[in-house]
Amino acid sequence: NPWQHKIQYKKTWLEMDTLFKDNSGFEASYHFNINPNLDATAMQSIRAVVERPELWKVFINGNEVSKTEGSFWIEKSFPQFSVGEFLKPGKNTLTIKALRMHILAEVMPVYLLGDFSVVPNDKGFEIAGGNIDTLGSWKENGLPFYSQKVAYSQNFNISGLENMAYKVKLPNWKGTVAEVFVNGQPAGLIAWQPNELDITSSLKEGENEITAKVTGSLKNTFGFFYQNNDNWIFGPHSWNYAPEKAPSGSEYFLMEYGLMEPFELVAVKL
């Protein structure tokens, strides 16, 4: 990777692209397994994300696919490719081919998106059916790489708002921020100690639905995965290490995210 440790002066590195001949291309293949318990609808939903699509031809199980115009993941450098129609239970292969080597043609991760979970196997993870349906770590619920939001809802019956204050408290959660909604309306954020939010003004007499949406981060999406996460700073050097053989997904270093215990509604008499 010439971009990790080099400094571009004018066009010094970009001009090296002229050194590559027309027949200097290469290909890289990514193999993954799909568990038979993944239903057809979920399999059809799967999309692949390949960076810099202008440099590659993309194939899934030997079938060439094109990016979906206007469909991006995270930002415009991450276009999506609909690949679900060419997938099957068992082993699948996504291949990128460069007809000519290019100075920007780095072999980077390819991402798979869709309505599925993953389970550890001997080498990494296997795509499977299922979704989060309980409290606890996203890692243990089949979404170890998920970075977005999971909503947790509870109903509370309120009798007597006068001279009372009500706070939502998250006693045990892992995430970057939690959004709180009362009866479908935003009530505020929880992001630091004491992990509580006054929602008195959002409540009504009787039944109230309270939802906490916990947000993860891109750390578990982009990695790194093969060494401990305890360092206080991360940089390009953090990706320099990889084991000799692909480890089981159960050995990946991943951060905990999720709501570990039910949130509480604390009533305080004024």
Predicted regions and their residues:
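An acidic-aromatic loop/edge-strand motif
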Residues: 1-25, 52, 67-75, 81-155, ...
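Solvent-exposed beta-strand/loop surfaces of large extracellular or lumenal domains
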Residues: 53, 58-80, 179-197
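Generic detection of short hydrophobic beta-strand segments and adjacent strand-loop junctions
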Residues: 32, 36, 81, 85, ...
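Active-site-adjacent substrate/metal-binding segments within catalytic domains
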Residues: 20, 29-31, 150-153, 166-168, ...
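Short, solvent-exposed secondary-structure boundary motifs
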Residues: 47, 145-147, 189
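Aromatic-lined ligand-binding clefts that engage carbohydrates, nucleic acids, or primary amines
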Residues: 33-62, 94, 156-183, 210-214
